[in-house]
Design a protein with these regions (language model features):
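Catalytic loop of the DD-peptidase/beta-lactamase superfamily, centered on the K-T-G motif
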Residues: 1-134
């Protein structure tokens, strides 16, 4: 089992929904994010030092979020190399759809590719944006 599958268009809709939830804003149509959504994106520090929020990851050091997304960002990765990262501070959703298991599952440096892509997107959208403080 490799998780959930979708396409870029639907994942963008989901990302926009999550962004609205993190900002406490309503969406134009459809299911509204719960009022508690923003609290689900805050790092829980459990166990101590963990970067995990409730169902989400948050940026820490070298992560799949790259180095430019804000510390308020939250995201999730998938086994096949996919990722979604949402930055409420800059109102950005980044989706990466890949298949890291083709032709082989032996791709130990694949996590770095996610970070490179996230940084490339952020640099394109926000030229000169500084790295996130650690």
């Amino acid at each position: 089992h490799a998780g959930l599958f979708s396409d870029a268009e639907d994942l963008l809709r989901f990302g926009e929904w999550a962004l609205a939830g993190a900002l406490g804003q309503p969406v134009v149509s459809g299911l509204q994010p719960p009022k508690e959504f923003a609290s689900w994106t805050i790092r829980q520090d459990h166990p101590a030092g963990s970067s995990r929020a409730l169902g989400w990851d948050t940026p820490s050091g070298i992560s799949s979020a790259g180095t430019i997304m804000s510390s308020r960002s939250f995201g999730h990765t998938g086994y096949t190399g996919t990722s979604i990262w949402i930055d409420p501070e800059r109102e950005v959703v980044i989706i990466l759809l890949t298949n890291r298991v083709n032709p082989t599952r032996d791709t130990p440096k694949f996590g770095l590719i996610r970070a490179v892509v996230a940084d490339a997107v952020m640099r394109a959208l926000f030229p000169g944006a500084p790295p996130r403080p650690h």
